[in-house]
Amino acid sequence: MAKIVDIKGREVLDSRGNPTVEADVILDNGIVGSACAPSGASTGSREALELRDGDKSRYLGKGVLKAVANINGPIRDLLLGKDAADQKALDHAMIELDGTENKAKLGANAILAVSLAAAKAAAQAKGVPLYAHIADLNGTPGQYSMPVPMMNIINGGEHADNNVDIQEFMVQPVGAKNFAEALRMGAEIFHHLKAVLKARGLNTAVGDEGGFAPNLSSNEDALAAIAEAVEKAGYKLGDDVTLALDCASSEFFKDGKYDLEGEGKVFDAAGFADYLAGLTQRYPIISIEDGMDESDWAGWKGLTDKIGAKVQLVGDDLFVTNTKILKEGIEKGIGNSILIKFNQIGSLTETLEAIQMAKAAGYTAVISHRSGETEDSTIADLAVGTAAGQIKTGSLCRSDRVSKYNQLLRIEEQLGAKAPYRGRAEFRG
């Protein structure tokens, strides 16, 4: 038994300079597992609650001392003496202690940090890498794959201070033979994109996730710039590299309309579905995230019926890693993929349940970071340990993003042929 003898919480900073929660879970043999909770900017209304202090005199109200106190008090008292290897029991005990639908009492940030720290401690106690322990918890021991990275190289929306409405423009090196080659391809495209933007006299400062954040004439202009960078890097768009969007449509859905302020265009749901379908015809876009507002289920159904047979339609704000909402979406034929962010639901156990439900229904699962990240690289192990096949963890700069890519390089080196990189086969259509 990996007996828990102490739990410590603390306030640390995320990549935006805002406080977040870190937890240590200490075992009787001296092993310490540590994990940090990430934080989002564009958040779904049904996400589990991130507990903030609201004290404007500290960190502009964004302190997390209440969540830390919950770790050092009630959560610690609850879990002392328990087995860190029994992930379900730990997570369910914390969920029960919280007693709310959205973890509002203890805070999803507090529960998640402890949940992940316990998993890390248990993996060390077993003498196995975290991805192997996660595969065991997932009921898929020894079944691994290296994920296709969805690299966010132009940032807009809530992730950047520019006039671009769509939040993320991503490249996917689907033609790579392994993850290391995929990472190299992405990095080369990123550097060529910088040169393309500079040649146009555009800003090459980066946004929250490390992508460039220039002012552009339209959303399609971002795609054209990326297409030029891919070509200049020596790759073939559509074969070696495909494209993906995260619209984060809930951020520009106003009064029942989709308002693209940067382009001066306003659409109803059917019109916006046509707009997105047009982009997929002109560019090899094989994945679109949050193409409709989280509450516009009729719009989502229309978009799914229109392009879902050939394009991966990912629910982020729509599903918020929540099995109850995902189940309803599956039953209604809404989308065909789920974005997995463990702080949306607040525990490792519930995260694994969402991945399992998605896969059982033939939906894909995309493991994702948040825009507010730390050096914690747990999502890399989660992607490999669940054989999810895809990961979103930002651009090719900023160490809060690159830490995940570097962990994936280490894992691929360890696993070799046991963790295949499947490229285009991981996507629909």
From Swiss-Prot:
Q: Where in the cell is it found?
A: Cytoplasm; Secreted; Cell surface
Q: Which metal ions or organic cofactors does this protein require, according to UniProt?
A: Mg(2+)
Q: Which InterPro entries match?
A: Enolase, Enolase-like_C_sf, Enolase-like_N, Enolase_C, Enolase_CS, Enolase_N
Pathway listed for it is: Carbohydrate degradation; glycolysis; pyruvate from D-glyceraldehyde 3-phosphate: step 4/5
Which cysteines are cross-linked by disulfides? none
Residues involved in (2R)-2-phosphoglycerate binding: 167, 341, 370-371, 392
Which GO cellular component term is one of those annotated? extracellular region
Question: CDD domains of this UniProt entry?
Answer: enolase (cd03313)
Q: Which UniProt keywords apply?
A: Cytoplasm, Glycolysis, Lyase, Magnesium, Metal-binding, Secreted
Q: What is its EC number?
A: 4.2.1.11
Kindly indicate whether the keyword Metal-binding belongs to this entry.
yes
Binding site residues for Mg(2+): 246, 289, 316
Tell me how the cofactor is bound: Binds a second Mg(2+) ion via substrate during catalysis.
Q: Which residues form the active site?
A: 209 (proton donor), 341 (proton acceptor)
Q: Which domain of life is it from?
A: Bacteria
Kindly indicate whether the keyword Zinc belongs to this entry.
no
One biological process term from GO is: glycolytic process
Function of the molecule = Catalyzes the reversible conversion of 2-phosphoglycerate (2-PG) into phosphoenolpyruvate (PEP). It is essential for the degradation of carbohydrates via glycolysis.
What family name appears in the similarity comment?
Belongs to the enolase family.
Which HAMAP family is this protein grouped with?
A: Enolase
Quaternary structure note? Component of the RNA degradosome, a multiprotein complex involved in RNA processing and mRNA degradation.
Q: Which protein are we looking at?
A: Enolase
Instruction: Tell me which species this is from.
Output: Pseudomonas aeruginosa (strain ATCC 15692 / DSM 22644 / CIP 104116 / JCM 14847 / LMG 12228 / 1C / PRS 101 / PAO1)
Encoding gene per record: eno
